[in-house]
């Protein structure tokens, strides 16, 4: 199942509002406030890569007060080789 981590920058003071909105988006599994360069991290899963990119580029990016995002799509799942 395609999965991505999305780092978001928001309008100052809007972090909790954006986290609440993220939790309403289908496919968003978790969303947390951060301290540092980015304001929020979210984990997103979908049935296909097309659906995943739609969620990120349309639903998440268009949340009010989201200024920018950095998306990291996981290339494979499972345990690392030993």
Describe the function of each predicted region.
Residues 1-82:
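A compositional/biophysical signature of low hydrophobicity enriched in polar/charged and small residues
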């Amino acid at each position: 199942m395609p999965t991505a981590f999305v780092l978001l920058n928001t309008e100052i003071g809007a972090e909790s509002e954006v986290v609440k909105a993220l939790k309403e988006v289908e496919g968003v599994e978790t969303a947390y406030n951060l301290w540092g360069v980015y304001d929020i991290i979210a984990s997103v899963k979908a049935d296909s890569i097309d659906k995943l990119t739609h969620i990120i580029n349309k639903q998440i990016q268009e949340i009010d007060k989201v200024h920018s995002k950095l998306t990291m799509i996981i290339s494979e799942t499972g345990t690392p080789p030993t």
